[in-house]
């Protein structure tokens, strides 16, 4: 049986919800093209988040891992290209930790690329009417920390597994707490994630399309 692990993150920075977990939870138990989706919530706590991610991988033995996180301020599903080996926390995590300029993994490589077909996913999302783009930076907070931890685990312990990270926008209800922030309806985000999973399962390579930026 093929398993897809999809993770979301608990709420942080005073927000009552986190759409990344709302999406993952909505997809838990669904079957897409013969694969079963299994959802896990991860904490917004440095170190612990990656330990719980590895535990979830070991418990579920997925062939594909799709890690999700909130990027409040973005207006589209952002399929991340690269994870970097640094934590530079602008705000404390949910346990009060605020590491600055420390590596995610001591002596780890500077960066890892996603092993998802990022451009194929963006192309499929746009074709389905869901706003999406390739993102060149997952930031330096917990999302990048999780993304790097996932790719390090794949590189060192699970080379046949594929995985990557997608940042999701705020929902309208969440954006209303922060006037001026863009949003995307939760049902559209859930539908988009189904497209992302289906595309990742069906695509081993990637499309040769421009997804870069000028700055």
Curated annotation (Swiss-Prot):
Keyword annotations from UniProtKB, A to Z: Cytoplasm, Hydrolase, Plasmid, Protease, Thiol protease
Domain of life, per lineage: Bacteria
GO cellular component terms attached to this protein's record: cytosol
Pfam families: Peptidase_C15
Signal sequence region: none
PROSITE patterns xrefs: PYRASE_CYS
InterPro entries named in the record: Peptidase_C15, Peptidase_C15-like, Peptidase_C15-like_sf, PGP-I_bact-type, PGPEP1_Cys_AS
GO biological process entries: proteolysis
EC number(s) given by UniProt: 3.4.19.3
Enzyme's top EC category: hydrolase
Cell inner membrane listed as a keyword: no
Subcellular localization, as worded in the UniProt entry: Cytoplasm
Recorded catalytic activity of this chain's protein: Release of an N-terminal pyroglutamyl group from a polypeptide, the second amino acid generally not being Pro
Active site (catalytic residues): 80, 143, 167
Chief place of localization: cytoplasm
A molecular function (GO) term: pyroglutamyl-peptidase activity
Keyword Zinc included in the entry's annotation: no
Family: Belongs to the peptidase C15 family.
Function, in words: Removes 5-oxoproline from various penultimate amino acid residues except L-proline.
NCBIfam families cross-referenced by the UniProt entry: PRK13197.1, pyro_pdase
Subunit structure: Homotetramer.
Protein's name in the database: Pyrrolidone-carboxylate peptidase 2
Organism of origin: Ralstonia nicotianae (strain ATCC BAA-1114 / GMI1000)
Encoding gene, per UniProt annotation: pcp2
